[in-house]
From Swiss-Prot:
Keyword Nucleotide-binding: no
InterPro entries membership: AminoethylPonate_ABC_PhnV, MetI-like, MetI-like_sf
Subcellular location, principal: membrane
Keywords, sorted A to Z: Cell inner membrane, Cell membrane, Membrane, Transmembrane, Transmembrane helix, Transport
Protein name: Putative 2-aminoethylphosphonate transport system permease protein PhnV
Family: Belongs to the binding-protein-dependent transport system permease family.
GO cellular component, one term: plasma membrane
Membrane topology: Multi-pass membrane protein
Amino acid sequence: MLIWSPKGRAAAGVVASVLFIVFFFLPLAVILMSSLSQQWNGILPSGFTLNHFVNALHGAAWDALLASLTIGFCASLFALLCGVWAALALRQYGVKTQKWLSMVFYLPSAIPSVSVGLGILVAFSQGPLQMNGTLWIVLTAHFVLISAFTFSNVSTGLARISADIENVASSLGASPWYRLRHVTLPLLMPWMMSALALSLSLSMGELGATMMIYPPGWTTLPVAIFSLTDRGNIADGAALTIVLVAITLLLMMKLERIAKRLGQK
């Protein structure tokens, strides 16, 4: 740590705790209370109800949940596949070449998501590859936005795997495909699951690009939440936000648990 004295560490801990409560816990607590409130005209809600959650789990909101899960899993799995392939392929190049080629994957993370959405909308609104108004354009945008994080996680895991392990397998007569399937991928699996969890959480919460390109019938949860709050329906929007946070956290915890279990094998 940068702070060596016990009093300094204690003070830093207090400051960090206060910042966590103010900027993370309190906003979530306010959203939760808003989702349970009948009316909120004062400092605290005047009554509590579950009707907002009932509304959040029926009709269009339920369709938005299914759309978010479908888009999130499909985009994350494709990003994971491409991230693993790219990380494995870049190992064959020198350090300088790896650095420049890696920038291709990291570039989308440096561009605002709205700009990514606009670019994809303009590029694929007419032939020869027209995807505007279809699910594919949303999947493309999510893939572009999350691929950098998937590639980064997988590359980090691959760098921690000793090359001696693969060399031993090769010296024993294992083919490249056998080494990949029985040596490299099993060792890389914990990082792959962590990358999948991170990609899924990012996709589930993506709004900027999705707002510009989503077709009818594929409204995601963030878009549905924005639409509700934009119409002044704060309580239903808050309930849907809690549903989004809960589902995303549960999925991340499950995938991270799988990754931890695989890492212990």
